[in-house]
């Protein structure tokens, strides 16, 4: 038969030929198709006959075989007592189980097959066999309320205090009243008390704690994993063994170890509904956002709504704590960054430490105040020249600057009457004071005392005056240049000729405070007198200032002598 390409080529050619030839070509192709179909049917029939001959001559063969455990469980599930007896006679163990740990006795107790139960027990089946969740046949019979099977199992020695993985005993799971009465009667007959029940409940955890202590004593790794990748903390978390988990966590086991399925201990606690265990793990750093290999978080594995609400609350609290810690770390980083990289360690001080620190600071300040007061008292009794003491770094600043210039008109001109040791006639007396000046370059100058300056030609009408240097007491820091200028001004006050002009100037300043203030001391010109004269002095020496006269000396002297009186 022609291929598809040949048919397309032939079709293009047939479009150009007459109708009669196209009809003949179509008949030819149809005959070829029928011939091909007949050949296919003949081959198919031949293959069928050949296969039938093989089946008839080959005989019957066994192709499927089952394990003994599967066959025994399947016969027990079908309640086929004869087949079960056949397997038991052929030395098949009655304790064979499937992948869930379920034995034939478990299955018969669930389905209430009393005959097979007796048959299995008579052939030595384990009456206390446990599946993967530690359920015994008595657990199954009590849960289903099969009172007849409960009696048979107790007669064969079933453990009435067997505890499953959920911590439940058979009487905890029994809801049928007659069956529960039988179990409680058997427990009372065996002398089981509440204390013994409590001991049996905590026995698995106590055994695990004892094993952990043995591992610690032997120096073994507490993060040991089993064949499924589970650690001791996984087991404690799944079973709710709080004391065992606390012991493991106290010895530094990891809370983020995953088994082969990607489960952490918190996932196991969430899946089996261990609420207190989940809180304990979260408090030790377990992540509520950890995911398994199936992309499941602990909250996704919860079945109880109450437990889900608890995990959501724990997650919210954890997020709040992490945000507060992040803000605290950022504030600490800002504080330490300003201090430079000096290798200091930032730690949080307790309330008592901060209180003691404040108390020490207050005591230090009190001592400094007491020392300064005593020094003021000592220096106030001394009358002499100004003595200047300076530190080793006084000449480090080559360009000292006046921090706060003081106007000469701001000097007070009155002295309180209580501070006068003698009546003021033609001069003013300044009291003694002592204080310190801090220089701009870090040096400290101490003025131990201020000598008494008597103005030879002072204003007799002024009753009292404040110390001329009292305005400098709060002006700090001072420079060496300023101290030299102050010393020059002090010598000016003690000069017998220049005191005349200063005395009259101070008196007028005290009388009319609304007049314009004098220029700064550090200026080039400083008018000290009211008669038109200006005082010039050098800024680097302690010599008395120079006078610049704008009028004849005789006229100035006449004005000076005219404003003074002799008493």
From Swiss-Prot:
One of its GO terms (cellular component) is perinuclear region of cytoplasm. One of its GO terms (biological process) is positive regulation of blood vessel endothelial cell proliferation involved in sprouting angiogenesis. It holds the Pfam family Ank_2. Its main location: membrane. Residues 378-403, 504-525 are annotated as: Disordered. Induction: Inhibited by TGFB1. Down-regulated by LPS. It comes from the Eukaryota. One of its GO terms (molecular function) is enzyme inhibitor activity. Interacts with PPP1CA, PPP1CB and MSN. Interacts (via its fourth ankyrin repeat) with the mature dimeric form of RPSA/LAMR1. Interacts with EEF1A1. Interacts with PTEN. Interacts with ECE1. This is Protein phosphatase 1 regulatory inhibitor subunit 16B. The gene is PPP1R16B.
């Amino acid at each position: 038969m022609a291929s598809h390409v040949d048919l397309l080529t032939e079709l293009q050619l047939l479009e150009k030929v007459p109708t009669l030839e196209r009809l003949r070509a179509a008949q030819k192709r149809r005959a070829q198709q029928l011939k091909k179909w007949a050949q296919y049917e003949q081959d198919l029939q031949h293959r069928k006959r050949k296969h039938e001959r093989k089946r008839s001559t080959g005989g019957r063969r066994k192709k499927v075989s089952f394990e003994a455990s599967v066959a025994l469980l399947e016969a027990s599930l079908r309640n086929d007592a004869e087949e079960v007896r056949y397997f038991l006679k052929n030395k098949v163990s009655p304790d064979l189980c499937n992948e869930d740990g379920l034995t034939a006795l478990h299955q018969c107790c669930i389905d209430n097959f009393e005959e097979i139960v007796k048959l299995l027990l008579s052939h030595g089946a384990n009456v206390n066999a446990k599946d993967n969740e530690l359920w015994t046949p008595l657990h199954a019979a009590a849960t289903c309320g099969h009172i007849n099977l409960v009696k048979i199992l107790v007669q064969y020695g079933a453990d009435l205090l067997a505890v499953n993985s959920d911590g439940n005993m058979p009487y905890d799971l029994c809801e049928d009243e007659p069956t529960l009465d039988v179990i409680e009667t058997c427990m009372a007959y065996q002398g089981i008390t509440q204390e013994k029940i409590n001991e049996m409940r905590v026995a698995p955890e106590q055994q695990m704690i004892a094993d952990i202590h043995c591992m610690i004593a032997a120096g073994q790794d507490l993060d040991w994993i089993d064949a499924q990748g589970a650690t001791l903390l996984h087991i404690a978390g799944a079973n709710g063994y709080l004391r065992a988990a606390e012991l493991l966590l106290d010895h530094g086991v990891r809370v983020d170890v995953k088994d082969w399925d990607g489960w952490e201990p918190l996932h196991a606690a969430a899946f089996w509904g261990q609420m207190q265990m989940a809180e304990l793990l979260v408090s030790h750093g377990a992540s509520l956002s950890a995911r398994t290999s199936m992309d499941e978080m602990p909250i996704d594995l919860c079945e109880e709504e109450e437990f889900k609400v608890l995990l959501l609350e724990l997650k919210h609290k954890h997020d709040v704590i992490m945000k507060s810690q992040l803000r605290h770390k950022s504030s600490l980083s800002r504080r330490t960054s300003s201090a430079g990289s000096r290798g200091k360690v930032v730690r949080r001080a307790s309330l008592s430490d901060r209180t003691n620190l404040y108390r020490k600071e207050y005591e230090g300040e009190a001592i400094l105040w007491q020392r300064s007061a005593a020094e003021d008292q000592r220096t106030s009794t001394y009358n002499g020249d100004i003595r200047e003491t300076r530190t080793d770094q006084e000449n480090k600043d080559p360009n000292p600057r006046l921090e706060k210039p003081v106007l000469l008109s701001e000097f007070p001109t009155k002295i309180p009457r209580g501070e006068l040791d003698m009546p003021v006639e033609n001069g003013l007396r300044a009291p003694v004071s002592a204080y310190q000046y801090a220089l701009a370059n870090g040096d400290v100058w101490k003025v131990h005392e201020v000598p008494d300056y008597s103005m030879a030609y002072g204003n007799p009408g002024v009753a009292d005056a404040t110390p001329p240097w009292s305005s400098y007491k709060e002006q700090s820091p001072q420079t060496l240049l300023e101290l030299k200028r102050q010393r020059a001004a002090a010598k000016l006050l003690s000069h017998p000729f220049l005191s005349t002009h200063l005395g009259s100037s101070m008196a007028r300043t005290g009388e009319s405070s609304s007049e314009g203030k004098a220029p700064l001391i550090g200026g080039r010109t400083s008018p000290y007198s009211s008669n038109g004269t200006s005082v010039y002095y050098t800024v680097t020496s302690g010599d008395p200032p120079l006078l610049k006269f704008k009028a004849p000396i005789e006229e100035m002297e006449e004005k000076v002598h005219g404003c003074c009186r002799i008493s």
